[in-house]
């Protein structure tokens, strides 16, 4: 008799442990989002209990794990800490809305899961990780110019699609460009897009448009500025802002303009490309990067124009390197002082 009681008590305790282990936070208003909701148990099993061996990367606000669902679909799971001040309902509605967007060069957001103080975002798995690892990590294989040009055209197409859907990205940068199994560039939203970044200045230092520092209001032209910084990084293989550096190399805008004024614009290219590049394409990307990263937002092209330039459907306007607004680097040294 007592043995039976102890067995039942043991089973009940084990059940309580399992339930608490997989415990989630679900509220009534989330019923509308059930199709986009993953169970914590499914994500726990997919990542082998969020084992360190499945850790794929770390970000400022969270960690990323690779996983495999019971359907054999490969996924990436971002674990993000939440605080009590955040509007969870608004955050979840943003996630679901973004998940409905479809473009071949966007990282697909598949859904989410919520626990106490934690949000889990589920994405398509991108096996080659992010672009900045290839551009700025000398231990990684070098991307050829044809690969870079293919990637940047894909990212431009994805950003244009977002703008056509009246969606701002707000954090375009190399770390938010992921590479799939075929080395296609996929634009990721990062964490700033969902308001999990507590920094009031949306975006990342080095990619933030100068007017955004003052107004704090994101716009399509601010996205274009960030894309211009990315274009220069693609061609030069260097970070848009470097510390420390020679005065003319402090900002890629200054560096590229100096090379241009010396009559050697292509000399600003990534030395690792050696002779593996198309001169006209390099020149066009460098000039387009400067055009996008102009100080005055009204002078920057739209993403529709950018895509036309990259696809060869339109020709860049004539402009010398000392064109007003072109050679003005953003004064981040003053902002960060």
UniProtKB/Swiss-Prot annotation:
Q: Which reaction does it catalyse?
A: L-seryl-[protein] + ATP = O-phospho-L-seryl-[protein] + ADP + H(+); L-threonyl-[protein] + ATP = O-phospho-L-threonyl-[protein] + ADP + H(+)
Key word Transferase present in the record? yes
Which residues does ATP bind? 56-64, 78
Give the molecular function GO annotations: ATP binding; protein serine kinase activity; protein serine/threonine kinase activity
Fetch the InterPro entries from UniProt: Kinase-like_dom_sf, L-type_Lectin-RKs, Prot_kinase_dom, Ser-Thr/Tyr_kinase_cat_dom, Ser/Thr_kinase_AS
Q: Does the keyword Transcription apply?
A: no
Its Enzyme Commission number(s) read 2.7.11.1
For this UniProt record, the keywords arranged alphabetically read as follows: ATP-binding, Kinase, Nucleotide-binding, Phosphoprotein, Serine/threonine-protein kinase, Transferase
| Name of the protein | Receptor like protein kinase S.3
Organism expressing this protein natively: Arabidopsis thaliana (Mouse-ear cress)
């Amino acid at each position: 008799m007592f043995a039976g009681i102890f067995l039942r008590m043991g089973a009940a305790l084990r059940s309580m442990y399992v339930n608490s282990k997989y415990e989630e936070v679900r509220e009534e208003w989330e019923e509308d989002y059930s199709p986009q909701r993953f169970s914590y148990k499914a994500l726990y099993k997919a990542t082998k209990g969020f084992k360190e061996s499945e850790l794929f990367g770390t970000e400022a606000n969270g960690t990323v794990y690779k996983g495999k669902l019971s359907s054999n679909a490969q996924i990436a799971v971002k674990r993000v800490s939440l605080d009590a001040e955040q509007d969870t309902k608004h955050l979840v509605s943003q996630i679901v809305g973004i998940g409905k967007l479809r473009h071949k060069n966007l990282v697909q957001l598949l859904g989410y899961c919520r626990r106490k103080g934690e949000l889990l975002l589920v994405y398509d798995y991108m096996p080659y990780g992010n672009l900045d690892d290839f551009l700025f990590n000398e231990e990684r294989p070098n991307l050829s110019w044809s690969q870079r040009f293919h990637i940047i055209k894909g990212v431009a197409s994805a950003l244009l699609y977002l703008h056509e859907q009246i969606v701002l990205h707000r954090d375009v940068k190399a770390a938010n460009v992921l590479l799939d199994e075929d080395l296609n560039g996929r634009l990721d939203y990062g964490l700033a897009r969902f308001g999990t970044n507590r920094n009031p200045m949306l975006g990342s230092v080095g990619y933030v448009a100068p007017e955004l520092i003052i107004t704090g209001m994101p716009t399509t032209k601010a996205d274009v500025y960030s894309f211009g910084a990315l274009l220069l990084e693609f061609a030069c293989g260097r970070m848009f802002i470097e510390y420390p550096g020679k005065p003319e190399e402090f900002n890629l805008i200054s560096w590229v303009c100096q090379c241009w004024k010396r009559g050697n614009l292509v000399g600003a290219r990534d030395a690792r490309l050696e002779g593996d590049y198309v001169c006209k394409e390099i020149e066009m990307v460098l000039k387009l990067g400067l055009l996008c990263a102009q100080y005055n937002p009204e002078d920057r092209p739209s993403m529709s124009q950018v895509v036309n330039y990259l696809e060869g459907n339109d020709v860049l306007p004539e402009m010398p390197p000392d064109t007003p607004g072109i050679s003005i680097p953003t004064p981040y040294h003053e902002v960060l002082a």
